[in-house]
Amino acid sequence: MDTIGGMSESPYPTFPGVEAFDAVRTPEAERVHRKRMCALGYRIFGAMRWGQLGDGHISARDPILTDHFWLLDWGIPFANATVDGLVLVEPDGRVVDADGNPTGAVNTAGYNIHAPVLAARPDAVSAAHTHTQWGTPWSANVAPFRAISQESCAFVFDQSLFDDEEVEVLSYDGGKRIAAALGDSKLCILRNHGLLTAGGSVEEAVGWFVMAERVAEVHVKAPDGVAISDTAAGVAAATLAPASTGWRLFQWLLRSVVDDPSIVD
C-alpha cells in the first residue's frame, strides 16, 4: 500500500490555523517549512526522552538542492533542537550551512543511513530513526508487526525487515542495504537495532515513527496476541495507513508534548 504518494478521504476534521496536509508552497517556503518541522520533530523525540545517548536522527530533504538533506548539528540534544541548529548535508557527506559554508558535523551513521535512503526514495522527504524502549527489543525478534492492535493496521501491509547483523552502520554501503530492505514501504524493522520510518513529509515520517513505537510496545507486551483477519485489518488500514494519517499524528504530538512550537524559530 502506497502511503507516501497518495491519500484517501480522511474521516477526521482539519486543524484550525494549520496548513492543509497537501498544501503547495514555493520551493523557498517549502524549505522553511521542512526545516521547522524537522526541528519540531526532534523536539517531539526529545520529549519522549529519545536520543539522550546521541542515538538517532531525523532528516529533511532540501526542496531546492534535492540531493541534499538537513540533519541536527552534532552535539545538540534533541530537546534543544532549533531551525538554526540544523545543518545541510551534501551528497558526499560534507556539512555546510544554508549559504554553503563548511560548518558543524553530523552523526556518522546519520549520513550513512539517510543519504542512501533518500537517494533510493525520490518520493520520500524524510526518514526517522532512533533507539527506543520498545522498537529495539522487538527488532531482536526479527519479525514483522501483526494486526494485534488498531495502530498495527497502519503498518501490516506496508513494512519490511532488514535482517542483517550490521547494527553499527559505519559505511554508506551499509546504508544502501538498509535502503534496499526498506524498499517502497514506510517502515523498516532493523534487526537488533530498532525502527526506521520514511515519509513524504517530515510530519509523516515522525508521526509514523511514534506510532510504530507504540505498536512495538504492544508486540513486546502481547507477543502471542491474537491478530484480526487480513480483511478486518484492511478495513482499518483504509483510514490508518494513508500519508495524511502520519501527518495528523504529528499534529497531535505537537499539541501534546511541545508546549510552545515557536521555541524552534
Set out the residue ranges of the language-model regions:
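Short hydrophobic-aromatic micro-motifs
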Residues: 60, 69-72, 161-163, 189-190, ...
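A conserved C-terminal secondary-structure "cap"
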Residues: 4-41, 184-265
